[in-house]
From Swiss-Prot:
Subunit structure: Homooligomer of 24 subunits that are packed together to form an approximately spherical molecule 12-13 nm in diameter with a central cavity, in which large amounts of iron can be stored.
Protein name, entry field: Bacterioferritin BfrB
Major subcellular site: other
Boundaries of every Ferritin-like diiron domain copy: 5-150
Length: 181
């Protein structure tokens, strides 16, 4: 077997980085979900456990894309995540910041694919761009609702139970290596 020489293109290298970012995001959402569970906020906990699975699935979609293109994949470790929050709004604000960062990362991936003439890579990233619009909008809404609810966390929980859909991945989503959880 020959020794791995690293990514073939800048897009491939950024895809490897994004796999790391998505797995780290999944772990961060588990930490946020556990925080909400510890605060007896079951609706928020349920939502963030679901978000963690979604982020894991995103990582595996990236893996599958690279495998489909006969490119080597390295499964990375994850960064340390934040576990302590003073109040629910703080955890929600972190999630919003994280989604905005991911949006920037996905935009950069798409631009690099275009710059390199990687039309397959650019087309693949289009689904992720649309997904990020939805994710940022939802997290921004949750932060606003938390601000309005103030100390009345029951209102925030009611909003999540009533308005936040824990739905399966949208049709047209890329396949995830090993299947979606």
């Amino acid at each position: 077997m020959t020794e791995y020489e690293g990514p073939k293109t800048k897009f491939h290298a950024l895809m490897q980085e994004q796999i790391h970012n998505e797995f780290t995001a999944a772990q961060q959402y588990v930490a946020i979900a556990v925080y909400f569970d510890s605060e007896d906020l079951p609706q928020l906990a349920k939502h963030f456990y679901s978000q963690a699975v979604e982020e894991r699935n995103h990582a595996m979609m990236l893996v599958q894309h690279l495998l489909d293109r006969d490119l080597r994949v390295e499964i990375p470790g994850v960064d340390t995540v934040r576990n302590q929050f003073d109040r629910p709004r703080e955890a929600l604000a972190l999630a919003l910041d994280q989604e905005r960062t991911v949006t920037d990362q996905v935009g950069r991936l798409t631009a690099v694919a275009r710059d390199e003439g990687d039309f397959l890579g650019e087309q693949f990233m289009q689904w992720f761009l649309q997904e990020q619009i939805e994710e940022v909008a939802l997290m921004a809404t949750l932060v606003r609702v938390a601000d309005r609810a103030g100390a009345n966390l029951f209102e925030l929980e009611n909003f999540v139970a009533r308005e936040v859909d824990v739905a399966p991945a949208a049709s047209g989503a890329p396949h995830a290596a090993g299947g979606r959880l």
